[in-house]
Amino acid sequence: MIARLILIVFAINFSVLADDDKISLSLLNAELKKNYAFVERSLNKSQMKIDNSSGKIFFDETGITINVLTPFKENYRIEGGMIEIHDLFLDQKQLINVDQANNFFLNILIKGIDENNPSYRVNIVNNDIIEIMSTEQNALVSFLFYKNRLELIRYTDSIGVEHGIELRPL
């Protein structure tokens, strides 16, 4: 009787622990609101060139701040439907409406993921990748996890440049 009870308790605990290891949209949305240091690598296939940039991304109650530290110092502030771009080297600022940017990845970053949104499909692959496929723009964004931590984001932009963004929590 005691052995059976121990076996049942073990099975319940194991199933709870196994569920903790599964990635989900709620985990992705939580990970997308953390502050990170990042290294972004982009491959322009037409020029066969890889560019690198690095910086930090911060989330707060009203928006997102992205500080690019290399190769050029730029700050981006996304708030209230607008993107402010500040080129620190040239000391120039520009405002862009988020809707005019028409960027699938940016919209995911701002709004998060809702599995019932008809403008994209969600696919979980091998319990370590969440793919978001736009039904309107034929765009795919992949979020790669390691031990339930968002480690890498991959996407191809509208001009065919492939991007990989490695993340490290701050």
Model regions and ranges:
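Sec-dependent N-terminal signal peptides
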Residues: R4-N13
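Boundary at the C-terminal end of the N-terminal hydrophobic targeting segment
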Residues: V16-A18
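A short, Trp-centered hydrophobic/proline-enriched beta-strand micro-motif
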Residues: L28-M48
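Short, solvent-exposed coil/turn segments at beta-strand boundaries
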Residues: L32, F58-G63, I78-M82, V125-N127, ...
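A mature extracytoplasmic/lumenal domain signature
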Residues: E40-S42, T70-F72, G80-M82, F89, ...
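An acidic-aromatic
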Residues: K56-F104
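Flexible, surface-exposed loop/linker segments and immediately adjacent secondary-structure boundaries
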Residues: L90-I129
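Gly/Pro-enriched, hydrophobic low-complexity segments
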Residues: N123-L170
